[in-house]
Each structure stands twice: as structure tokens, then as C-alpha cells.
Regions:
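Glycine-rich segments within core transmembrane alpha-helices of 12-TM secondary carriers
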Residues: 1-19, 219-228
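A membrane-interface helix-boundary motif in multi-pass transporters
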Residues: 17-39, 233-268
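Short amphipathic helix-loop junctions that connect adjacent transmembrane helices
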Residues: 107-123
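Multi-pass alpha-helical transporter architecture, strongest
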Residues: 40-51, 261-294
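Helix-to-loop junctions at the C-terminal end of transmembrane segments
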Residues: 137-151, 235
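Juxtamembrane intracellular "pre-TM" segments in multi-pass secondary transporters
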Residues: 53-92, 294
Length: 294
């Protein structure tokens, strides 16, 4: 599913790209691309809304309950049972940390390309297309690999590849090398994103997938500002200090960006270390053994 979504993103980009590249002197094509993307998304979502049916059976509300009170009571039940899901909690902590590394890489890829390698708009667009193509294969192959050898192992491999790409970028000096690194990162990061969501479903008890996915989504959204903030403060702080010491502005900015890249690696490595302490077997057992008391 993640691979198909990435492929759809490539198709949308290719459809709007000619107008953005060919029409000069105005930002109208860029503004129009947002409208086109919204329409593209709406049309693509229609089959889901119209033809996919819920498998679950409708359950009547308990006496004296409405949907809001029932939601809060079940949330309280899940919070009270948190000790039962220690492996899932460790998994979420690991996710919060390495996901910030992923967000940092996505948010600053274009800036890194422009500052370190002098990439122009056309080159950045080509870079994004390459990353998207790589992400299709990364999501698809990580899913197959996870089905065969285990999703935890697939996630670890994807994170190791991502860390390798970031470390390589620390020392890379060529534009061609950056294109290769970005493609490897695109391949790895979609594997991370796809497999983490799959593992959330695997770790969720029967009938509580929505609660666990909601917790997973909220945790990721509420923490995702930390990594980019660290990157921005570090890159800017290092650059300003070097400029104050008399270093040429561009060189100072480049060193600042490499300091930021190092922080990406730190987030990914720390997240991986915590992930290695998670027992997939115990997490699955906890989900199977859980019997909620309504």
C-alpha cells in the first residue's frame, strides 16, 4: 500500500512538472499545482469511499453511553493497562526518536543539496523524482522482506541503511554522490515508515487496532518538531559562530549543514539502539494474551 501511494505521488508530480518547469516569470503554476494535487487526491480516494466496505460488524452502544463517553472510557482502560504493553511502549519511544531523524532528512534534503552542492531548482526536482522512485521499491521490498524474515528485522535493516546513507553524506563531496545517497535514503526511509505502521498493527490486541494506531500517529505528530528544531539550531549556531570568527560565509554554512547532518545520524542511532531492546515475540504475546476488562 505504501509503495502504491509513493507511485501515485510520482504520477502526480510528473503531471504538474511540465507547467512548473516551462512557465517562467510567475508562481501561478506552483499555486495551480496545489489545486491539482488536491483534485488528484480526491479522485484517487473515491474508490475507497465508494467501494471498500467495513469488515467489522456494527455493535450497539452500551446502556448509558454515547460515542464520546465510550471513547474516553476505552482510552482510560488502555492507559490503565499500559504496563501490559511494555514492549510496545519501548517500540514507541524508539519510533519517536528515529522518526525525528527521518523527518529531519526529509525537511532539510533540499537545503542540504542547495548549500553543500549548489543545486538549482531543476536539479532539486530531479532529486525529488529519484527519491520518490527509490521509495516505491523501498516500501515494496521491505514489506516482502518483513513477511519472510520478520518485520522487526526488516525495520532494523532499513534503519541501518538509512544511517549508512547519512554517514556517507557527512563525507561526500560530489553532486553525483549526493544523488546516490538521496536515492539510498529514499529507499530506506519508506521501508522504515511502512514497517513501523505494520508493526503497530501486529502489536495491537484484537479489536484495539484503531486505539494503537491513533496513539502511534499522535505520538509521531507531537514529537516531530524536536528533530528539525535541533537541526536548525545546530546548523545555524555553528555557521554563525564560524562566521563571527572570520570564516567565509558559504564555507561556514556548509560546515553548519554537516553539523546538522551529524545530528540526524545521532537520532537514528539512538532510536535503533532502543529498538534493539524490543522483543517482537513478547510484544506479540502481550497482544494475544490481553483481555480488557470493560
Amino acid at each position: 500500500g505504501w509503495a502504491i501511494g509513493s507511485a501515485g505521488g510520482i504520477l502526480c508530480l510528473l503531471l504538474v512538472l511540465p507547467a512548473i518547469v516551462m512557465v517562467k516569470g510567475t508562481d501561478l503554476p506552483v499555486r495551480g499545482a496545489f489545486v491539482f494535487t488536491a483534485i488528484f487526491f480526491f479522485i484517487s480516494a473515491l474508490p475507497t469511499f465508494l467501494w471498500i466496505k467495513e469488515r467489522g460488524e456494527h455493535k450497539p452502544l452500551p446502556d448509558g453511553k454515547n460515542y464520546l463517553s465510550l471513547a474516553f472510557s476505552r482510552l482510560g482502560r488502555t492507559v490503565r493497562s499500559v504496563q501490559h504493553f511494555r514492549e510496545f511502549l519501548k517500540f514507541i519511544v524508539a519510533f519517536l526518536i528515529f522518526n525525528d531523524g527521518i523527518v529531519m532528512a526529509l525537511d532539510f534534503a533540499a537545503i542540504i543539496g542547495a548549500v553543500l552542492y549548489g543545486m538549482n531548482q531543476t536539479q532539486l526536482i530531479i532529486l525529488m523524482i529519484l527519491v520518490q522512485f527509490a521509495s516505491v521499491f523501498g516500501a515494496y521490498l521491505s514489506g516482502i522482506y518483513g513477511e519472510r524474515v520478520g518485520f522487526m528485522r526488516a525495520l532494523i535493516v532499513s534503519l541501518v541503511l538509512m544511517i549508512g546513507a547519512v554517514v556517507w553524506m557527512l563525507f561526500n563531496q560530489t553532486l553525483v554522490g549526493f544523488f546516490i545517497i538521496a536515492s539510498l535514503a529514499g529507499f530506506a526511509l519508506t521501508g522504515v515508515q511502512a514497517v513501523t505502521r505494520t508493526m503497530t498493527g501486529v502489536f495491537a490486541p484484537k479489536g484495539q487496532s484503531a486505539e494503537f494506531y491513533s496513539f502511534f500517529a499522535i505520538a509521531g505528530k507531537t514529537s516531530s518538531f524536536i528533530g528539525p528544531t535541533v537541526y536548525g539550531l545546530l546548523a545555524t549556531g555553528v555557521a554563525l559562530r564560524l562566521e563571527a570568527g572570520g570564516m567565509e560565509v558559504l564555507l561556514a554554512e556548509q560546515i553548519g549543514q554537516r553539523a546538522g547532518i551529524l545530528s540526524i545520524a545521532v537520532f537514528l542511532v539512538v532510536g535503533l539502539v532502543i529498538l534493539l531492546s524490543v522483543s517482537e515475540q513478547r510484544a506479540r504475546k502481550a497482544a494475544l494474551d490481553y483481555a480488557p476488562a470493560d
